[in-house]
Amino acid sequence: MNIKNSLILIISTIFVLSMINGGLTSDPTCVGAPDGQVYLFSSWDFQGERYVYNISQGYLSLPDGFRNNIQSFVSGADVCFVKWYPSEQYQITAGESHRNYAALTNFGQRMDAIIPGNCSNIVCSPK
């Protein structure tokens, strides 16, 4: 076997193994969030349970499994991530993604809600 064939075999093996292990699906471009949607994940690296938020939903108090548990996300829209008490807000833009959002800012472990548009649109917390 010559060097060229050996390299082709090695590269093909790496490619196949990465597909089997899900390595290629961890890329946010593969996960893909369509325009107007945000994918929220309960595990880092775009894994675990996935919640699909659509901006047509307006204000959303996160469901129990995701409240204080956003580990990674992919955004196809401008949205505001919110923590009500004490008040914190993070502006997220379309095309933004984080593999380990909880570790990066620790905010994923405190997040309560998501609001479409800019954080400046927030007037007060819901009662």
Curated annotation (Swiss-Prot):
Subcellular locations according to the entry: Secreted
Residues of the signal peptide: 1-25
Single GO BP term: spore germination
Bridged cysteine pairs (disulfide): none
Glycosylation sites: N54, N118
GO cellular component, one term: extracellular region
Main location (coarse class): secreted
Keywords (A to Z) from UniProt: Glycoprotein, Secreted, Signal, Sporulation
Family membership noted in the UniProt record: Belongs to the Dictyostelium gerABC family.
Name this polypeptide is given: Spore germination protein 1
Source organism of this protein record: Dictyostelium discoideum (Social amoeba)
Lineage: Eukaryota, Amoebozoa, Evosea, Eumycetozoa, Dictyostelia
